[in-house]
Amino acid sequence: TVNLYLRNSWYHNTIKEFIRRGEIGDLAIIRICHMTPGLAPGEGHEYEGPSFHDCGMHYVDISRWYAGCEYKTWHAQAIRMWDYPEPWWLQCHGTFENGVVFDITQGHVYGQLSKDQTHNSYIDVIGTKGIARMSHDFKTAVVELRGVNETHRIEKPYGGKNISTLCDLFADSVRTGVFNSRLPLMRDSAIASEYAWKFLDNARRNE
């Protein structure tokens, strides 16, 4: 689950390479937002849990992927829409063990019945010297990189689920007999699932 499209996406890999080159200084803050009309309760998410587990665990994973560290503290709040027993919007902020701060907002409550539907999906990666950010509308992704030496604005097709990239990485591992480091471990999926549930549980405890 965690590798289908976010870890394989051109935009996240572009941002991570920019960070690796030291262009934003030390990584300090990761802000992710993914709000869409999405699926309403009863339309598919319940098989894998509430919206934040079924969909939100992708963002739990990608935040950890950027931080390169484990979650340390968190505080979550959520809202139940339409009198449904499970929350369909959740916001969680906290820290990683290395001091990096995170903020994840995810929900499928973004105007289901609006005449012209829209989305609000982005990531802000803030360092001690520069920033990298991305936004998309499921058709086009725009990456903006503002570092100490380089400034770029890259606009490309969004890329969908990137299953072809996943297949290529797996095939490379089979062909060479060496596990491709861009592939996650099963442990990564388990951790993403575990913390998505922890954040949901924390939200239930908070007003």
Language model regions located:
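C-terminal "lid/loop" region of Rossmann-like NAD(P)-dependent oxidoreductases
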Residues: 150-159
